[in-house]
């Protein structure tokens, strides 16, 4: 039996936006059953609410951003990833700016915040999106694909011509569970190349980026003094991003995801393609104690 989850307590954090460089105050609040994940721009008058839905994605350049009633919410993928990892279904995310705080560039600080607030089960079954047939989208040589699978599994392959990202560290798979997510994926940081800095700054991107919140590489090496958290941290972060992007489907996917050089744009295209084909998926719940749980979530952490 898998129940919906929300926070036990309200919790707050402060940080800077990776791309905007703006300081942002974030408040995470509990929400009722079937409320879903909703972002709230409290700096606007009137306040605007933006549901975490794939169809509202309008920004896919180096982040995933949502727009609703002209209000933007940028760089949602790391928090969305942490919410998926801990099985949180219902939450209100209040922001004083358009972009979520980047924290350390991973989902680890968001996991800590959510666990510190406490996670509680609610009196309603969690709703899953079960993949019924293969759905694939491509863009050049990039591929993102869902296939039917009893559980939730993610595989990802990256290709970078860089000595710090050899082929043997460019492929990773994970059988999704809270334990696997928190240990193997959540601490993997976003990364960028010095050669791309000029491109980003011309587009007002990465203005809040630093070695405190990203892995930075020159042509030969990692420039961060503390090095990497995992030998294959780069591909693990791509899985972290994918978990967040796919959670915008409006529920936890049950199926196998495969990404080859995929990014935010293709991940969003895949979710939209899945949801657009009514024969490709169905809503399911597991509200009988006799039914095996398809995904292992950690016991709720009561703060």
Swiss-Prot record:
<comment type="function">
    <text>Catalyzes the hydrolysis of UDP-3-O-myristoyl-N-acetylglucosamine to form UDP-3-O-myristoylglucosamine and acetate, the committed step in lipid A biosynthesis.</text>
</comment>
<keyword id="KW-0862">Zinc</keyword>
<dbReference type="GO" id="GO:0016020">
    <property type="term" value="C:membrane"/>
</dbReference>
<dbReference type="GO" id="GO:0103117">
    <property type="term" value="F:UDP-3-O-acyl-N-acetylglucosamine deacetylase activity"/>
</dbReference>
<dbReference type="InterPro" id="IPR015870">
    <property type="entry name" value="UDP-acyl_N-AcGlcN_deAcase_N"/>
</dbReference>
<feature type="binding site">
    <location>
        <position position="241"/>
    </location>
    <ligand>
        <name>Zn(2+)</name>
    </ligand>
</feature>
<keyword id="KW-0444">Lipid biosynthesis</keyword>
<keyword id="KW-0378">Hydrolase</keyword>
<comment type="pathway">
    <text>Glycolipid biosynthesis; lipid IV(A) biosynthesis; lipid IV(A) from (3R)-3-hydroxytetradecanoyl-[acyl-carrier-protein] and UDP-N-acetyl-alpha-D-glucosamine: step 2/6.</text>
</comment>
<dbReference type="InterPro" id="IPR011334">
    <property type="entry name" value="UDP-acyl_GlcNac_deAcase_C"/>
</dbReference>
<dbReference type="GO" id="GO:0046872">
    <property type="term" value="F:metal ion binding"/>
</dbReference>
<dbReference type="GO" id="GO:0009245">
    <property type="term" value="P:lipid A biosynthetic process"/>
</dbReference>
<protein>
    <recommendedName>
        <fullName>UDP-3-O-acyl-N-acetylglucosamine deacetylase</fullName>
        <ecNumber>3.5.1.108</ecNumber>
    </recommendedName>
</protein>
<dbReference type="InterPro" id="IPR004463">
    <property type="entry name" value="UDP-acyl_GlcNac_deAcase"/>
</dbReference>
<dbReference type="InterPro" id="IPR020568">
    <property type="entry name" value="Ribosomal_Su5_D2-typ_SF"/>
</dbReference>
<comment type="similarity">
    <text>Belongs to the LpxC family.</text>
</comment>
<keyword id="KW-0441">Lipid A biosynthesis</keyword>
<feature type="active site" description="Proton donor">
    <location>
        <position position="264"/>
    </location>
</feature>
<feature type="binding site">
    <location>
        <position position="237"/>
    </location>
    <ligand>
        <name>Zn(2+)</name>
    </ligand>
</feature>
<keyword id="KW-0479">Metal-binding</keyword>
<dbReference type="Pfam" id="PF03331">
    <property type="entry name" value="LpxC"/>
</dbReference>
<keyword id="KW-0443">Lipid metabolism</keyword>
<feature type="binding site">
    <location>
        <position position="78"/>
    </location>
    <ligand>
        <name>Zn(2+)</name>
    </ligand>
</feature>
